[in-house]
Amino acid sequence: MSTNPKPQRKKPNVTPTVAHRTSSSRVAVRSLVEFTCCRAGALDWVCARRGRLPSGRNLEVDVSLSPRHVGPRAGPGLSPGTLGPSMAMRVAGGRDGSCLPVALGLAGAPQTPGVGRAIWVRSSIPLRAASPTSWGTYRSSAPLLEALPGPWRMASGFWKTA
């Protein structure tokens, strides 16, 4: 018997394509923003707005990326809407017909005027990632806090207030 190891097939070096890099960075940004929203009180619900992907595709048109739409009275706990894997934008405040920050986390919270611009959708982040006990493990989302408008910041001192 030979003690030499069997020759292994050499795997070709595969460099990630632009599409791979774009989608992975989009997922990372989405997760950080979702987590910031969750820390503001939404838990497994976030208020989402359709927008353009970095590639220029419009989420309204691209069926594979669009979430199912929710009725105007739906909100956390009532919405049948689900979040597609590549939702590009999250609403950072209660402006321009978006979901009200004060309504986050309330069962049956109504959508604000401007139906169709912003909808309640389930977050793709596991519920346990949004729990208060895990907040300290997601410090990488800190730069996003500065970009959030006043209503999203908690007055407890955990986040800066306006």
Swiss-Prot record:
Its main location: host cell. One of its GO terms (cellular component) is host cell perinuclear region of cytoplasm. Residues 1-23 are annotated as: Disordered. It is found in: Host cytoplasm; Host cytoplasm, Host perinuclear region. One of its GO terms (biological process) is negative regulation of cytoskeleton organization. Residues 14-23 have a biased composition (Polar residues). GO terms for molecular function: complement binding; enzyme binding; serpin family protein binding; small GTPase binding; structural molecule activity; zymogen binding. Keywords: Host cytoplasm, Host-virus interaction, Inhibition of host innate immune response by virus, Inhibition of host RIG-I by virus, Inhibition of host RLR pathway by virus, Viral immunoevasion. Contributes to the RIGI-mediated inhibition of type I interferon production. This protein is very unstable. This is F protein.
